């Protein structure tokens, strides 16, 4: 097994153990919960930068723009994690939501969405239009169903909540589902190809973000979220998978 994959598995296992036994070190867990995300997000940024360096030709090249989009998206998500850590660890704001961290995270979706869209559009010719359309319709219906399923309990918790907070709570899963849909289309296109592994990893990463943000939205609306909540593992694992996906892409294509 290649070293990056082994390290990722060991890291994921260590994270699961840390969260499982957090009652034994509750004070330290608060620090870890807020300090670790910028670190793992930074690792993902570095992995995307290596990809950008490999594929960069000139700004007019679509592949250069795609990897620039990946990198910019990860940078903004890293900034979101960093701002959250500053709020919690330096400014003593226990749960900074909504905050400037959300601005950075939401901005990050724009370059990521563009990169995913361009990637799919660039290579969709490799499968028949019939298969592509069938896949797009199926993925769209599944995504809509998941969003509708999530929206029901959110609407039930909306009473008395700030409009901005509720809007952000809805925006995250909606944007995650859009990325998830594009990732599945890319996986459909590249199944059996050299970069199928990369897009499989990205698909899993985006799905973890979908579930993680749905749970975060519900728990913040219900007032049950806390620093060190097990749902944070989904975001940690997602960053690990993105970093691995960028690595796999560089090695296979």
Where do the PLM segments sit?
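Polytopic alpha-helical membrane-helix bundles and their juxtamembrane interface segments
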Residues: 1-253
């Amino acid at each position: 097994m290649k070293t990056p994959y082994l390290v990722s598995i060991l890291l994921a296992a260590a994270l699961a153990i840390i969260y499982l036994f957090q009652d034994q070190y509750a004070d330290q867990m608060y620090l870890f919960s807020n300090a670790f995300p910028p670190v793992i997000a930074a690792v993902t940024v570095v992995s995307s930068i290596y990809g950008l360096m490999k594929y960069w030709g000139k700004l007019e090249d679509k592949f250069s723009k795609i990897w620039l989009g990946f990198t910019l998206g990860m940078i903004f998500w890293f900034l979101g994690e960093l701002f959250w850590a500053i709020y919690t660890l330096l400014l003593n704001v226990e749960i900074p939501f909504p905050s400037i961290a959300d601005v950075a995270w939401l901005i990050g979706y724009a370059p990521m969405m563009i990169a995913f869209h361009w990637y799919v559009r660039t290579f969709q010719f490799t499968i028949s239009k019939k298969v592509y359309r069938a896949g797009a319709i199926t993925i769209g219906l599944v995504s809509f169903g998941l969003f509708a399923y999530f929206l029901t309990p959110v609407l039930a918790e909306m009473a008395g909540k700030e409009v901005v907070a509720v809007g952000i709570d809805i925006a995250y899963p909606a944007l995650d589902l859009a990325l998830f849909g594009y990732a599945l289309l890319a996986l459909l296109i590249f199944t059996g190809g050299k970069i199928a592994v990369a897009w499989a990893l990205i698909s899993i990463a985006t799905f973890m973000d979908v579930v993680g943000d749905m749970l975060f939205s519900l728990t913040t609306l219900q007032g049950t979220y806390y620093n060190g909540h097990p749902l944070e593992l989904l975001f940690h694992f997602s960053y690990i998978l993105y970093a691995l996906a960028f690595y796999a892409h560089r090695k296979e294509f």
